[in-house]
Design a protein with these regions (language model features):
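C-terminal accessory module of base-excision DNA glycosylases/AP lyases that mediates lesion recognition
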Residues: 1-36, 103, 116-119, 134-209
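Alpha-helical ds-nucleic-acid-binding substructure associated with the helix-hairpin-helix region
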Residues: 4-6, 22-25, 29, 57-58, ...
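Alpha-helical scaffolds flanking conserved acidic
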Residues: 13, 43-47, 79-82, 120-123, ...
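Structural motif
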Residues: 38-47, 92-95, 181-189
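Residue-level detector of well-ordered alpha-helical segments, enriched
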Residues: 44, 48-49, 61-65, 97-100, ...
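Conserved short-loop catalytic and cofactor-binding motifs
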Residues: 50, 89, 110, 146, ...
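Generic structural marker for isolated residues within well-ordered, non-membrane alpha-helices
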Residues: 50, 66, 84, 123, ...
Length: 209
């Protein structure tokens, strides 16, 4: 695998320098931004489960649910398999999310082999599991595997940040933003981090966990 892996804050700085040359709008805002977070996470079942919990809910709501899940021990495969639906509802999971969580617990994902797969293959492998769409797979590749050239164009905060920064009338669609983000290769994941920080600055709230 020849893909660049984001390992440290120095990688973020390198990516920001490259993005300044690629996109004038980025060049304008980077000096005005606080430190762009590294956002590297561990990989494995626990982190993928956490990303599923984050789907289509606010950062605050996801954090609250995740705290309850960890307290109950439901961040472990064996505990989820033994849990009743009511026990999973009690920690804040919706009926649909319970299905997704059980699907993940029963999946045969080889987390170790994901580390050396091309990003496109990682997304393909993960999205075979019910409840894992492109957004979840791309966020996992970005934060847990450290891939530098992956974006999550289905993310509403990234869409809104792009609309604000580029003075667009409407948020770009997932398809439109995917096309736009290709211009930021090979540092799409750093562009995403920059846009989330810009969203936070403009909206005074976090756009990503």
């Amino acid at each position: 695998m020849e893909e660049r892996i984001i390992m440290s804050q120095e990688c973020i700085s390198e990516g920001l320098a490259a993005l300044s040359n690629l996109e004038p709008k980025f060049d304008q805002i980077i000096p005005k931004m606080d430190k762009i977070p590294l956002r590297r996470r561990s990989d494995g079942f626990d982190r993928l489960l956490s990303t599923i919990v984050s789907q289509q809910v606010s950062v605050a709501a996801a954090d609250a649910i995740w705290r309850k899940i960890k307290l109950a021990g439901f961040n472990k495969i064996t505990k989820i398999k033994k849990a009743s639906d009511q026990e999973l509802r009690d920690v804040g999971l919706s009926k649909q999310k319970i299905k997704y969580v059980r699907s993940l617990a029963n999946s045969k994902i080889d987390y170790r082999s994901l580390r050396t797969m091309p990003t496109s293959q990682v997304v393909k492998e993960l999205t075979q599991v019910s409840g894992i769409g492109n957004w979840t797979a791309e966020i996992y590749a970005m934060f847990s595997l450290g891939r530098a050239d992956v974006f999550a164009p289905g993310d509403l905060a990234l869409q809104e940040a792009t609309r604000l920064l580029f003075n667009l009338k409407e948020r770009p669609s997932e398809k439109e933003l995917r096309s736009i983000a290709k211009d930021w290769s090979p540092w799409q994941a750093v562009a995403a981090r920059l846009l989330w920080s810009y969203y936070n600055q403009q909206k005074k709230r976090e756009g990503i966990r």
